[in-house]
């Protein structure tokens, strides 16, 4: 819901200013939730997740900038990076803990929280991490898109819930690179990922265990 260059971290009170259909839809969805909360006097909370990422299992899961850079390195032999773009990365496991805190709390001080982390990084820095951990001679192709610095502040959430991200971006990139290299054919050629029977069973039922035992 935000685009452009912000010198300071963006607080929840900052007016939304995004570009494109996706940004418009998200902003309208937030407004609908807020209006419904006020009109119905219900406890509705909107959560903004800042650049969520995870280790993809196959090509269809490549939906974040980290995985996209790893895939470019594997398939194209180069990594594209915008020299002007700086942002924050939130690992999937941290996001799960954050959301659990909100869900398990009976009363919320605010109706809007931004889930962010201290992993503020530029595209160029991120590309360098990928290049290092992919152990590849791929070049980093830079461009200047004028996107700027756009980092969501997670201060409101941290003050109320007393938690902060514990994921290590560099370490997670290392794990992602190792996994994608190991299963290169799955990502580059889109071959079917072959798993042992116990992993297939685990993937089918792990959601239930996550609900029963969140941590």
What is each stretch, according to the model?
Residues 19-45, 74:
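Active-site Tyr-X1-5-Lys
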Residues 81-211:
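C-terminal substrate-binding subdomain of Rossmann-fold SDR/epimerase-dehydratase oxidoreductases
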Residues 2-4, 47-64:
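Flexible, glycine-rich beta-alpha linker
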């Amino acid at each position: 819901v935000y685009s452009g260059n912000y010198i300071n971290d963006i607080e929840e009170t900052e007016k939304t200013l995004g570009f494109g259909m996706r940004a418009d839809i998200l902003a309208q969805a937030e407004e609908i939730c807020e209006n419904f909360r006020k009109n119905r006097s219900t406890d509705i909370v909107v959560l903004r997740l800042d650049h969520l990422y995870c280790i993809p299992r196959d090509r269809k899961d490549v939906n974040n900038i980290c995985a996209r850079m790893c895939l470019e390195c594997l398939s194209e032999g180069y990594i594209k990076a915008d020299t002007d773009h700086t942002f924050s990365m939130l690992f999937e496991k941290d996001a799960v803990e954050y959301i659990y805190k909100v869900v398990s709390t009976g009363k919320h001080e605010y109706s809007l929280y931004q889930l962010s982390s201290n992993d503020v990084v530029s595209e160029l820095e991120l590309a360098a991490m990928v290049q290092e951990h992919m152990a590849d001679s791929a070049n980093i192709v830079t461009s200047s898109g004028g996107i700027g610095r756009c980092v969501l502040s997670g201060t409101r959430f941290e003050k109320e819930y007393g938690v902060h991200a514990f994921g290590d971006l560099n370490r997670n990139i290392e794990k992602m690179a190792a996994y994608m290299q190991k299963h290169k054919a799955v990502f580059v050629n889109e071959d079917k990922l072959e798993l042992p029977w116990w992993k297939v069973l685990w993937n089918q039922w792990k959601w239930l265990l996550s609900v029963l035992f969140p941590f």
